[in-house]
């Protein structure tokens, strides 16, 4: 009788453990999985809102960039001495923003959100990607162009050579054209979010820079835009 009670007790315990499996297998309450996100317009808006703080210029941007110009270049020249900076310690050779933008574009493209709103937020991301790449082109010239998220273990993609400057600029223009065509043409009373007018303003600035560059570098054989 004692053995029967022991066996019954063990079986009861096992049944309780098995029945609790679903209860114990809970997703973290402070994290979202991709499958739980990108399902609504609000999701897309929240994700793109994170780009503003990370990628818009701050108060020191002008000062820092002036250090690369003619006025203060003598004081900043050690920055560009061979070996002084590398991809490890130089902030501009950083691809986390590009990775986040490409990840969003890929996820948003397959989102069930209504097409017009979906294209608007993809346009926001592509505008930020254009700006990110333009800053890199101004600093480095040729850079590798990534239009899709890549596997962090894919060394061939991570270590591949730079793409020609002209190809990257053409890709930047394609991103800006998409943004102009798809961003909402609605005045933002708060003047704090990306609209079609913002895209047109950025496109004009980049076109002026690139057109001037090509005009005074005829040896490159590039069409003036």
Predicted segments, located by residue:
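Bacterial Sec-dependent N-terminal signal peptides
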Residues: 1-29
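Acidic, serine/threonine/proline-rich low-complexity intrinsically disordered regions
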Residues: 149, 214-225
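TPR/Sel1-like alpha-solenoid repeat signature
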Residues: 126, 200-206
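Conserved, well-structured interaction surfaces
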Residues: 33, 43-49, 55-57, 74-140, ...
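Membrane-proximal, proline-rich intrinsically disordered regions
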Residues: 20-63
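Short coil/turn linking the two alpha-helices of tandem helical-hairpin repeats
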Residues: 137-138, 144, 187, 209-218
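Aromatic-lined, polymer-binding surfaces characteristic
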Residues: 142, 146-148, 190-201
């Amino acid at each position: 009788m004692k053995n029967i009670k022991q066996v019954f007790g063990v079986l009861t315990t096992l049944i309780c453990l098995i029945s609790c499996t679903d209860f114990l297998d809970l997703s973290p309450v402070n994290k979202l999985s991709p499958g739980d996100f990108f399902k609504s317009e609000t999701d897309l808006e929240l994700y793109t809102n994170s780009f503003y703080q990370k990628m818009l210029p701050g108060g020191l941007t002008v000062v820092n960039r002036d250090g690369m110009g003619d006025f203060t270049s003598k004081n900043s020249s050690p920055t560009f001495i061979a070996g002084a900076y590398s991809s490890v310690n130089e902030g501009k050779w950083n691809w986390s923003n590009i990775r986040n933008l490409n990840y969003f574009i890929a996820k948003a493209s397959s989102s069930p959100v209504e097409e017009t709103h979906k294209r608007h937020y993809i346009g926001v991301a592509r505008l930020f990607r254009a700006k990110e790449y333009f800053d890199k082109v101004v600093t480095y010239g040729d850079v590798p162009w990534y239009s899709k998220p890549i596997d962090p273990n894919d060394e061939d993609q991570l270590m591949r050579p730079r793409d020609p400057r002209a190809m990257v600029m053409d890709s930047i223009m394609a991103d800006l054209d998409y943004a102009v065509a798809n961003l909402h043409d609605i005045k933002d009373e708060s003047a704090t979010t990306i609209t079609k007018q913002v895209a047109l303003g950025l496109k004009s600035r980049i076109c002026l820079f690139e057109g001037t560059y090509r005009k005074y570098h005829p040896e490159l054989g590039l069409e003036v835009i």
